[in-house]
Design a protein with these regions (language model features):
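RNA-binding accessory domains that recognize and position tRNA/RNA substrates
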Residues: 1-183
């Protein structure tokens, strides 16, 4: 597993290992302290453009359920796609077990081109964010050739890792990005 870093706007760096898509991305770094519901949280439009830190120590242990539903409503998700820019966890579990699971968290993130970092002390990071407030951050992958350091979400495709700026999602029209195009 390649090494990765979360670099905060204040210069702080947190090192870990990649999972999901191996690419660079940036966004506002926020945290969630929930014990369950990572698929719902990751697809929640209110997290659009953000790098999400999950404080529960083991994420991915129940996998990701099927995304099918009825009448264009998803039974296990909050929207039709992952909304976050990246995911930061203490430990990403590859061996999942749940009757409704269809795939691992890492596989799902790869399908949606979302990078993640595991092996980070998410509770220390959360304390920093709680005392300093949310900050802009970026995920960069060590050891990948520059041409492979593409952005983690379609809004950032083609950005070279070391050149990824601290993107503030609040400067964009997020409502337009998450709204349905037609009824």
């Amino acid at each position: 597993m390649p090494q990765a870093k979360l670099i905060l706007q204040d210069g702080s760096e947190f090192e870990g290992f990649t999972f999901g898509s191996e690419g660079a991305t940036s966004g506002e770094v926020v945290f969630n302290t929930g014990m369950v519901g990572y698929p719902e949280t990751m697809t929640d439009p209110s997290y659009r453009g953000q790098i999400l830190v999950l404080t529960y120590p083991l994420i991915g242990n129940y996998g990701v359920p099927d995304d099918s539903g009825a009448d264009n409503l998803f039974k296990n998700f909050e929207s039709d796609r992952i909304q976050i820019q990246g995911l930061i966890v203490s430990e990403a579990c590859e061996n999942f077990s749940h009757w409704s699971a269809k795939q691992s968290l890492s596989t799902w993130m790869k399908q949606h081109n979302i990078p993640g970092i595991s092996g980070i002390d998410t509770r220390a990071l959360t304390k920093k964010l709680r005392s300093s407030g949310t900050m802009l951050g970026k995920i960069v992958i060590d050891g990948l050739p520059r041409e492979m350091q593409l952005g983690g979400n379609s809004a950032f495709s083609g950005i070279i890792s070391q050149g990824v700026d601290f993107d503030d999602p609040n400067a964009r029209n997020l409502s337009a990005e998450v709204s349905v195009r037609e009824p």
